[in-house]
Amino acid sequence: MLDPKLLRNSLDEVAARLKTKRYDLDVDAFSQLEERRKSVQVRTEELQSERNSKSKNIGMMIKQGQDPQPLKDEVAKIGEQLETAKAELQDIQDKLDDLLQGIPNLPDASVPEGASEDDNVEVRQWGSVREFDFEPKDHVDLGESLGLLDFNSGAKLAGSRFVVMRRELARLHRALAQFMLDIHTTEHGYQETMTPFLVHAHALQGTGQLPKFEADLFKVPGEHDFYLIPTAEVPVTNLVREEILDAKELPLKMTSHTPCFRSEAGSYGRDVRGMIRQHQFEKVELIHVVAPEQSDAALEELTGNAERILQLLNLPYRVVALCGGDLGFSAAKTYDIEVWLPAQKKYREISSCSNCRDFQARRMQARWRNPETGKPELVHTLNGSGLAIGRTLIAVLENYQQADGSILVPDVLEPYMGGVKVIKSAN
């Protein structure tokens, strides 16, 4: 959530910056609510002061032997007016809060201008794209020909955008998750964290998925207000909700391997083939909670940590800076990491690394105690995939495929595969 003071003091400037994110702020609606809020707040304070003053006079009248009843009646009437004003003020504040909850984060000054992903700016590339002496297959043809990737069974169990993995491929998927966690915890200093896969609505509000993106979520019917998590960003970041962290606890770096559940409501017709866009997938998430002055460096570090996984797997990739029009709701700045997929002959997103500044922290009231002031201040939060496991599996299948349809196991994964070096058809 944006700082309400910033909106009050620089409304036109904020509106102009939000336009670069393809968001039109309703300036008139905010201004009208804010004027009403100020007017009713002044009225409330005046009534409170008047009631307090007259209440004191009641005691004086009693001491002087005067009849206080007329003044008591007047105080009671003022009290009724005060309660009405307080209720009106709360109603206005609720409307302002609802409006604020729907306003996205402001883009950093360093974010490239642009309207869509076509305007994103490449920052760097790593690795050499492999030259095949045969026509490379996509992951669907490879997995199905090996008898290890089964979309028909996934559809039988749950419908479209689900898959069943078998034998060596299921093990390779598990190996990737373990490998990522091992690197992030032993080399990069993250705390491994296990959280619930179900959360209440307030957790999703804290990280910005609610109220704007409810259609993208799976809600569990019943007496509990539960949603399936769309990313581990939600439960892990919310661990600092309504907390005041000590300065020595920062930076706080956490990693978590979870399933993720998304309805893909806005993705009809996109990536319908294969595992690129699934309703259920797994991901290793990276979370940083930092002091404000640490967040610029933290974004570079987090992105580098995600890149390290691809480097160790020897998968070519590039990093792009998202333009304003392609930024997510809560992000102030984002780097996407895109891995090379030979069958598509292009780079595809495998990680999105974002600095949310104090946007999520304000929604969650996540703070740290600044030793210089001794006062609680909002932290900055960052998140990124380190990596999406299904998409990493796709990249391994396509980049390590052989002419006979077999798949070489990357060297770094062999210890997790029980010495299996090549994945072949069982037939």
Curated annotation (Swiss-Prot):
Pathway noted in the entry: Aminoacyl-tRNA biosynthesis; selenocysteinyl-tRNA(Sec) biosynthesis; L-seryl-tRNA(Sec) from L-serine and tRNA(Sec): step 1/1
PANTHER family on file: SERINE--TRNA LIGASE, SERYL-TRNA SYNTHETASE
GO molecular function: ATP binding; serine-tRNA ligase activity
EC numbers for this chain: 6.1.1.11
Any one of the GO BP annotations: selenocysteine biosynthetic process
Localization per Swiss-Prot or TrEMBL: Cytoplasm
Domain of life, per lineage: Bacteria
Key words, A-Z: Aminoacyl-tRNA synthetase, ATP-binding, Cytoplasm, Ligase, Nucleotide-binding, Protein biosynthesis
Designated name of the protein: Serine--tRNA ligase
CDD domains found in the cross-reference section: SerRS_core (cd00770)
Family listed: Belongs to the class-II aminoacyl-tRNA synthetase family. Type-1 seryl-tRNA synthetase subfamily.
PROSITE patterns membership: AA_TRNA_LIGASE_II (PS50862)
InterPro entries for the chain: aa-tRNA-synt_IIb (IPR002314), aa-tRNA-synth_II (IPR006195), aa-tRNA-synth_II/BPL/LPL (IPR045864), Ser-tRNA-ligase_type_1 (IPR002317), Ser-tRNA-synth_1_N (IPR015866), SerRS_1_N_sf (IPR042103), SerRS_core (IPR033729), tRNA-bd_arm (IPR010978)
SUPFAM superfamilies for the chain: Class II aaRS and biotin synthetases, tRNA-binding arm
UniProt keyword S-adenosyl-L-methionine present: no
Binding site for ATP: 262-264, 349-352
Source organism per UniProt: Hahella chejuensis (strain KCTC 2396)
Summary of subunit composition and partner proteins: Homodimer. The tRNA molecule binds across the dimer.
Positions contributing to L-serine binding: 231-233, 285, 385
Biological role: Catalyzes the attachment of serine to tRNA(Ser). Is also able to aminoacylate tRNA(Sec) with serine, to form the misacylated tRNA L-seryl-tRNA(Sec), which will be further converted into selenocysteinyl-tRNA(Sec).
Entry remark concerning the domains of this protein: Consists of two distinct domains, a catalytic core and a N-terminal extension that is involved in tRNA binding.
Annotated catalysed reactions: tRNA(Ser) + L-serine + ATP = L-seryl-tRNA(Ser) + AMP + diphosphate + H(+); tRNA(Sec) + L-serine + ATP = L-seryl-tRNA(Sec) + AMP + diphosphate + H(+)
